[in-house]
């Protein structure tokens, strides 16, 4: 018994020695397995294997099987002839081959970066799992290759040794100085280091012996210099819209003043740039805008008063300290989607990245630090699946973010069982989980938007105002939503001290979002003017049901104000196949499968749904329909949208004599109400000759009166207007000619060119005027020639 362990090690050592020798000589290493072709099925293969002392390891594919022989050496430099020849003589065996061990190397196998500062990048992968799980994404082979990221900031030091290898000029521009070079402006205080530091977090080169590594260290990185100068709406829009089909991700760590009293957001051009980015960027998949949530924590600011982070088009990121606490500068709001790491207290580590003047720093901090980390993780995710849309990415973030290790007192479970916080969103980004889920991700259904006006009259806010409204989330319309993504409460209100207000929104599934917390420094009496407070906390909930808006005065003062407008805007999806035709209401009788067979009065049945107006090409008609009940078949008279005759474009019935309008290739007979095809010659003759007068209907045929197209009252105003204009013109011309005849010989005439007959006479100018302007005949002729040439040009145009 004691010899068995020794025997195992001897065999293992012998096998290893065989491999080493074979590798050195370049020889084949034969294994104790065979691939065998045996028609007839697995039972025949099993029988042949047992007959010759083999074990059938299973089917490779088709009639090919994998045989193993325990008595044959596992590794050998020569083939096993005896067993091979026995199998070869078997009639059922059509082909066989002893298997050879092949050397195969994994490509892009993960190796830990060798950069000197990498061990200090605790947030990429740590032993306590308080990290972003970036090394797991690297181990899966994703490093950001093929993805382009642009940092919208104060420039990027493109010649930095840890950035130059990944620098992309196509993702860079200097909007401040209007040139392609984004190099920052150097000052004694290094004020413009922001963009260079952010760039290093995303794509610092790996294994080059400089500084640390970027999250997506094989991604391409660029920068837009747009903050080192006067920032206008045009500057922002141009930066946000730079090369949208080349740049995949835009990272921004800036916004309005974080002073606890500002309410500001993108203006017209920047808002349009956001919309164009998500609708047209990346070939229609949508640009991804990553935004830092804000630095106004000390001022009790709310990032819902920042229109950039509060936008549905941005992926808003917050931060946590090394030990999972809320940083002192962090802002809380319901628009935050997820969190990455940044700095905190003095005894906690900060972020390692590139710095100005080709240096490295270990003390990067603030919102500048955490948004670029998210941009890098998103670059890894896009490499795993380049077909992800901008909304797919937000779905992945919601589904994979981890609330563990993050400390806050406002963690809550929403209506679909996810934990969410105003400080952290759905938790820490998990790079490994995101790339794993992205690889087989199915694109979400197209976005739907449901807009509901809640208020019917202004309401006094007082100490506390509560507005309740039960909604169907646009049921029966194309915008019907069953799975929510973003929800907006667009509010217009006046209040004498805006900072005392706290606003909450409660979803039908009970999720309570803080749209606005009290801001002690906000003394403004401006209120809010159609401001869209956004929440992501009800993601994937069913928005149908009662929504509750709560507005509260948090101070003891007798403040006053009025809520004048409240519009609930829901963004989301509905399951594929859910019927959402226009005006799908008014059904009177439903089948067991919820298909409509009879509509209420004023509605017509169209494709198993009730509509108030039949679509073009259809007309309502009362027909007998057969309705199958459990034990019988009933005949029901119902209004149904029936198709027009093939010759009609629109109609009032299914017959060829029910046409109201015709296709472009046909003309309408106003008497017969039929459409007839026209040849090219007949169309030309109709254009040259006036149409014949309408033929009166035969007197002897008694038919039901029908509204004729040539008697429609809608043409009467046009006829009256035309006759009136003709009469006025006739009177004017008559009076003008009479006056000209009476005074025609007492004034001089000037001939100028016109388009029609070439000459027209302007009369009525006194001779003194000509003498004053034309001191000589030559000057008069010259002036007349110039005017004539001018009028010729104008007439030609």
UniProtKB/Swiss-Prot annotation:
GO biological process: cytokine precursor processing; peptide hormone processing
Cytoplasmic face of the membrane: 740-797
CC cofactor note: Binds 3 calcium ions per subunit.
Site residues by UniProt (Cleavage, first): 107-108
Chain sites annotated for binding Ca(2+) 2: 174, 179, 181
Reactions catalysed according to its record: Release of mature proteins from their proproteins by cleavage of -Arg-Xaa-Yaa-Arg-|-Zaa- bonds, where Xaa can be any amino acid and Yaa is Arg or Lys. Releases albumin, complement component C3 and von Willebrand factor from their respective precursors
Topology in the lipid bilayer: Single-pass type I membrane protein
Transmembrane segments: 719-739
Processing and modification events after translation: The inhibition peptide, which plays the role of an intramolecular chaperone, is autocatalytically removed in the endoplasmic reticulum (ER) and remains non-covalently bound to furin as a potent autoinhibitor. Following transport to the trans Golgi, a second cleavage within the inhibition propeptide results in propeptide dissociation and furin activation. Phosphorylation is required for TGN localization of the endoprotease. In vivo, exists as di-, mono- and non-phosphorylated forms.
Name used for this protein in its record: Furin
